[in-house]
Amino acid sequence: MFENLTDKLERSFKILKGEGRITEIIVAETLKEIRRALIDADVNYKVAKSFTDEVKHKALGQDVLKSVKPGQMMNKIVRDELAQLMGGTATDIKLEGNPAVILIAGLQGSGKTTFSGKLASMLKSKKGRQVLLVAGDVYRPAAIDQLKVLGGQIGVEVYTEEGNQNPVEIAENAIKYARQKSYNTVIVDTAGRLAVDEAMMQEITAIKAAVKPSETLFVVDSMTGQDAVNTAKEFNDRLDFDGVVLTKLDGDTRGGAAISIRSVVNKPLKFISSGEKMDSLQVFHPERMADRILGMGDVVALVERAQEQYDEEAARKLKKKLVKDQFNFNDFIEQINQIKKMGNLKDIASMIPGMGKMLKDVDIPDDAFKQTEAIISSMTPAEREKPEIINAKRRERIAKGSGTTMADVNRLMKKFEETRKMMKMVAGGGMKMPRMGRGGVRR
């Protein structure tokens, strides 16, 4: 996400390298490159121009402190202005009324239905809400089926009315049903179209008037770039929505929509979404996104994701095993599963400062752990429990069973030993390593 833009912005800051003061000529040259980078990233031209004008105003005449280089000063100004351009601070979702009604709108294929499921999951798990999903796309049976599947995955009821082709009536009946069943949150998934048309606008406007939502969210596909911004503007002129959701940020997106949309539509970007997993939804934080665009990562988001998967009791048990030198392949595979739950590996890596740039051209597939899991699955329960018994003959059998080579198995065994040592040192506060079990390493 944003790797190309990040790379170009970093190159533009190098113009200031070696300068003792930020001068008008140097600023003009730097901002020319920044503006070009933004436009290449599909940022709206007027937004890019206004942004660089504001940066110029802030930068000119800045005295560079001895401890701060001009490039660092410009980087900070750009970071602050980027955050401001995207909204300044995060905007929370409004959950007013009983039930609180959230209306989801957008074009077909934008990811509305998947987002509806993700939002329901987030509100249920993080805010303790009792959520009802409403299948309001009466024109696409597949959308109704998809919502039912998502609801089943996250344990949320999906309200449908088979045979009823009136989405306004369905939404009204769903709210009555929610009150009867004591649901305090209703998420209405609506029909999309391949393009903005009058019939679509009339329908979504009628649904909004009927259900009086506390929040209307417009979902756009970030991969459509500037078209996403233009579509959002058209919708907002008619629907007057409350916030924007950007989906498919894990795709080949240049980032222009995320940067432009707040300024063009004058509505906050509230959520960003990537991937198909129900937990891959994030509240949009402008400051954090500015950091990621400038290659600074997003350590806060990384810690938050890790905390969501953290099991204190399991961690205590693992620490005991580590200290006693009992860490085995069952524990190893459990740690892999914890990492996988955190989401797309490349997305996680991009949250680590500098890592996104390093992995720009590296393809990290979602099944990156597949070979490791296959090898461990080919071990017997005894081998997983006591790795030290895995001799050459056993390794050969494991390789055949997993469809891998002896070299692959040996690499995994080496990686396992390194992981075991490292985790034991962390658990023991960096204490000196005692010898491993039989067949292990003596120190």
Cite the ranges covered by each PLM segment.
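Long amphipathic alpha-helical segments used for membrane anchoring, targeting, substrate engagement
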Residues: 2-19, 288-443
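Primarily NTPase-proximal linker/entry elements flanking Walker-type ATP/GTP-binding cores
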Residues: 8-136, 143-164, 171-190
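Residue-level signature of catalytic and energy-coupling elements of molecular machines
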Residues: 16, 42, 78, 107, ...
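Amphipathic alpha-helical interaction segments
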Residues: 29, 33, 50, 54, ...
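Generic secondary-structure signature for well-ordered alpha-helical cores
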Residues: 40, 57-60, 83, 87, ...
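Short, small-residue-enriched loops and turns at beta-alpha junctions
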Residues: 110, 139-141, 165-167, 192-196, ...
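Conserved phosphate-handling catalytic cores of large alpha/beta enzymes
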Residues: 171-175, 179, 183, 195, ...
